[in-house]
């Protein structure tokens, strides 16, 4: 009669994963997720800059049209939001925010012959690069920040 050995061990490969192996895998996945989320947020902030650029460039074009019709530039945000011919017809909220809600647009140093309009980041967009939180453009087409910072691209 043959006795079976109850202490026979199963080969290691058939037993599954150890707790340490699972923890290493979870740690690696957590690190990769952190890197991916950070890169995604940076990408979203860079993409949202388009909102400010579009608003400022739309105001610039509308200002030139307004100047041709009225022989002066619009000097206030209320005029910018008002429908033509009395205003520029720019799509902003009553408080001067872009429709996406990431920038506040305002006129600075506006006269009948000159203007400077700026868009300042608000909310989550304030986490953007310091150089790209405020955009400005004037009646001469001068843009701030300078294009070397990459904000207008």
Report the location of each language-model feature.
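Short, charged low-complexity linear motifs
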Residues: 20-30, 49-58, 85-91
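Periplasmic/extracellular, small/polar-rich flexible segments of pilin-like filament-forming proteins
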Residues: 2-3, 68-153
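Residues at secondary-structure transition points
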Residues: 14, 43-50, 54, 110, ...
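Conserved hydrophobic beta-strand within the GNAT/NAT acetyltransferase core sheet
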Residues: 19-22, 63, 119
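N-terminal leader/signal peptides at the extreme start of proteins
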Residues: 1-17
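Membrane-proximal N-terminal amphipathic helix
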Residues: 44-72
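N-terminal single-pass transmembrane signal-anchor helix
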Residues: 12-43
């Amino acid at each position: 009669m043959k006795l079976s050995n109850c202490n026979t061990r199963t080969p290691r490969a058939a037993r599954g994963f150890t707790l340490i192996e699972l923890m290493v895998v979870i740690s690696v996945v957590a690190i990769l997720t952190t890197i991916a989320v950070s890169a995604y947020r940076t990408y979203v902030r860079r993409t949202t800059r388009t909102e400010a650029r579009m608003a400022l460039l739309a105001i610039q074009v509308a200002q030139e049209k307004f100047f041709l019709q009225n022989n002066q530039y619009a000097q206030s945000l209320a005029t910018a939001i008002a429908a033509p011919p009395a205003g520029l017809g720019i799509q902003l909220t009553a408080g001067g925010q872009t429709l996406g809600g990431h920038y506040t647009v305002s006129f600075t140093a506006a006269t009948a012959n000159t203007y400077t309009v700026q868009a300042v980041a608000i909310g989550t967009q304030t986490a953007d690069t310091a150089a790209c939180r405020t955009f400005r453009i004037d009646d001469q087409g001068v843009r701030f920040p300078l294009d070397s910072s990459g904000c207008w691209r």
